Swiss-Prot record:
Taxonomic lineage: Bacteria, Bacillati, Bacillota, Bacilli, Bacillales
Role played: Catalyzes a salvage reaction resulting in the formation of AMP, that is energically less costly than de novo synthesis.
Keyword Glycosyltransferase found: yes
Chief localisation class: cytoplasm
GO MF annotations in UniProt: adenine binding; adenine phosphoribosyltransferase activity; AMP binding
Official protein name in the record: Adenine phosphoribosyltransferase
Reaction(s) catalysed by this chain's protein: AMP + diphosphate = 5-phospho-alpha-D-ribose 1-diphosphate + adenine
Organism: Bacillus pumilus (strain SAFR-032)
UniProt subunit comment: Homodimer.
Amino acid sequence: MDLKQYVTVVPDYPKEGVQFKDITTLMDKGEVYRYATDQIVEYAKERDIDLIVGPEARGFIIGCPVAYALGVGFAPVRKEGKLPREVVKVEYGLEYGKDVLTIHKDAIRPGQRVLITDDLLATGGTIEASIKLVEELGGVVAGIAFLIELTYLDGRKKLDGYDILTLMQY
């Protein structure tokens, strides 16, 4: 199935010159959303995944149905101040400054095989930070899955050494 036909490209959003990839027009078609999810599920099965980790918010949209299909748990990565219990955190760079991502300190057991999911691989900063959180807790990043990769931003370079699945490339 050609998933790109279900992604709406919105010009000049959120700012001029950006070609925003809107996945809601993929997700609102049940059979298409299921197909995309199933591709990631098959990838995960090949890697003997114990847990799915996804950064807010679209990492939840991708990761939760995969976790459900596999019968494994899902651990959210959130911005600082959004998780109620003790967390580990990592600071990461943004285009104009820094931000902090967190995960519950007890979300991952040492040795658990983790699949990190997100909607989009752009510069790789968010996923690089997510990897650091998983590994700090003793998890093994067994794979990383995205719906979309923006190849011209070279985000894959930050993830060198990790196994990556992308369903669409622009």
